[in-house]
UniProtKB/Swiss-Prot annotation:
Location (main, coarse): cytoplasm
Protein name: Probable cytosol aminopeptidase
The keyword Lyase appears for this protein: no
Binding-site residues, Mn(2+) 1: 268, 345, 347
Cofactor(s) listed: Mn(2+)
Similarity-based family: Belongs to the peptidase M17 family.
Binding site for Mn(2+) 2: 263, 268, 286, 347
Biological process terms in GO annotation: proteolysis
Cellular component, GO annotation: cytoplasm
Entries under Gene3D superfamilies matching the protein: Leucine Aminopeptidase, subunit E, domain 1, Zn peptidases
EC id: 3.4.11.1, 3.4.11.10
Lineage: Bacteria, Pseudomonadati, Chlamydiota, Chlamydiia, Chlamydiales
Molecular-function GO term, any one: manganese ion binding
């Protein structure tokens, strides 16, 4: 984890591998201009072609007497067009350049804070989170990687009051510990991150933090609770399912209680409805919802927010053998509702249904938010940059959108179209697990909503199928697991304290 430090002036700054000077579009930032006497011979020729456009970067060598070996000219664009997301993406791009240049220690000069259209807090959150997002290294198994980049180890931010800035940096670092945990769990081998291993990670959180209590139900306990849908999905696997319940109590006397549910399919072959080989290559990431829940809870415990949150992860493989659950058969969930299986590859909604029922029975939730890499239809609809979500409560939906805007984790609300619910009709069961071949993300959400029908609990379903994992580098994320959802939900939970 990179260490951040703030100081008001650059006079006594420490030596570093690089110094970053900010520039507006076709205009010097005043704080950068104040360093011209020190660096002008080095960067003046480069300014002839440097325009200061958003994300524009010029990497130069410094003068021999300077404290930094390299000078980086950083374009911030136009001040009047600056947003927190622009700041996030700009400093994320900067981080990628610095890592490739093997600059481990960096001094970053801020533009004049009082002249920004953003607040100091918004700018610093965007800066630190952009750096932290791209300063992650995913687990590697190769002995030698000659292209390995050098991660940033220390960033000194110059031009801000340290007391305020350092508090922001500590908060973002704690949040990204949770993001990194989520990414690590998703990126590792499916043979390593089994349902049992996810349970061990959850149990270790309980050992590390007094505010966390973890309970794990094994196969027999799952059967005792009559979670027939989770058991059905697990039938084809040689590893047992685990049902993980992690309770964080930051405000024990309060009745307000958020339940987070994460899909925990640690590998998804599709079952008897077997996926094509190419589609199966990334299916170790089908537990990203569960990993997101663990990342949120670990960060909550570090931040010590005065709030009550329970995380629930139904964890299993969706594997294939002679015992696999079969298309056309009917299984009964914990709710007592029966489901006709039309596709064994629509397994995520089945295990989430049992988790929702468990939450309603045992947790007395004020609200339920679930996370799942649920449908390919969502990827087709919104791509890999935006997660779609559904909600039965307008206040919850608006609060999630507010947190989304603060954290550069784009969410888009989709409708729960009642008319489409009829596509789930079954002649032999209470419902089918698959609707028509259209509006697949909506019908999946409608399936989940059926298990909340008699409840007044506010609910949101985040389909992170497109955003959880990227096979190439993105503006906001490194390659592979993104940890999408950890930051926005933590901001949502923190914001709820003032409402």
């Amino acid at each position: 984890m990179v260490l951040f430090h703030a100081q008001a002036s650059g006079r006594n700054r420490v030596k570093a591998d690089a110094i970053v000077l900010p520039f507006w579009h076709f205009k010097d930032a005043k704080n950068a201009a104040s360093f011209e006497a020190e660096f002008e011979p080095s960067y003046l020729p480069a300014l002839e072609n440097f325009q200061g456009k958003t994300g524009e970067i010029e990497l130069l060598y410094s003068s021999p007497k300077a404290k930094e070996k390299r000078i980086v000219l950083l374009g911030l664009g136009k001040n009047e067009e600056l947003t927190s997301d622009v700041v996030f993406q700009t400093y994320a791009t900067l981080t990628r350049v610095l890592r490739k240049a093997k600059c481990s220690t960096v001094n970053i000069i801020l533009p004049t804070i009082s002249e920004l259209r953003l607040s100091a807090e918004e700018f610093l959150v965007g800066l630190s989170s952009g750096i932290l997002s791209l300063n992650y290294d995913y687990p590697r198994y190769n002995k030698v990687d000659r292209n390995l980049e050098t991660p940033l180890s220390k960033v000194t931010v110059i031009g801000i009051v340290p007391k305020m800035a350092d508090a922001i940096f500590r908060k973002e670092a704690a949040i990204f510990e949770g993001v990194y945990l989520t990414r690590d769990l998703v990126n590792r081998n499916a043979d390593e991150i089994t349902p049992k291993k996810l349970a061990e990670v959850a149990l270790n959180l309980g050992k590390e933090f007094p505010s966390i209590d973890t309970k794990v139900l094994g196969k027999d306990a799952i059967a005792k609770e009559k979670m027939g849908l989770l058991l059905a999905v697990s039938k084809g696997s040689c590893v047992d399912p685990h049902f993980i319940v992690v309770r964080y109590q930051g405000r024990p006397k309060s009745k307000d209680h958020t339940v987070l549910i994460g899909k925990g399919v640690t590998f998804d072959s599709g079952g008897l409805d077997l996926k094509p080989g190419k589609s199966m290559l990334t299916m170790k990431e089908d537990m990203a919802g569960g990993a997101t829940v663990l990342g949120i809870l670990s960060a909550l415990a570090v931040l010590e927010l005065p709030i009550n949150v329970t995380g629930i992860i139904p964890a299993t493989e969706n594997a294939i053998d002679g015992a696999s659950y079969k298309m056309g058969d009917v299984y009964v969930g914990m709710s007592g509702l029966s489901v006709e299986i039309c596709s064994t590859d629509a397994e995520g909604r089945l295990i989430l249904a049992d988790a929702i029922t468990y939450a309603l029975k045992y947790c007395k939730p004020t609200r339920i938010i679930d996370f799942a890499t649920l449908t390919g239809a969502m990827v087709v609809s919104l791509g890999e940059e935006v997660a779609g979500f559904f909600s039965n409560n307008d206040v919850l939906a608006e609060d999630l959108l507010e947190a989304s805007a603060e954290t550069s984790e784009p969410l888009w609300r989709l409708p729960l179209v009642k008319k489409y619910d009829k596509t789930l009709h079954s002649d032999i069961a209470d419902m089918k697990n698959l609707g028509s071949n259209r509006a697949g993300a909506i019908t999946a959400a409608l399936f989940l909503q059926r298990f909340l029908e008699e409840s007044s609990v506010a609910w949101a379903h985040l389909d992170i199928a497109g955003t959880a994992y990227h096979e190439k580098e993105e503006d906001r994320y490194p390659k592979y697991a993104s940890g999408f959802g950890v930051r926005s939900i933590l901001y949502y939970l923190e914001n709820s304290l003032s409402k």
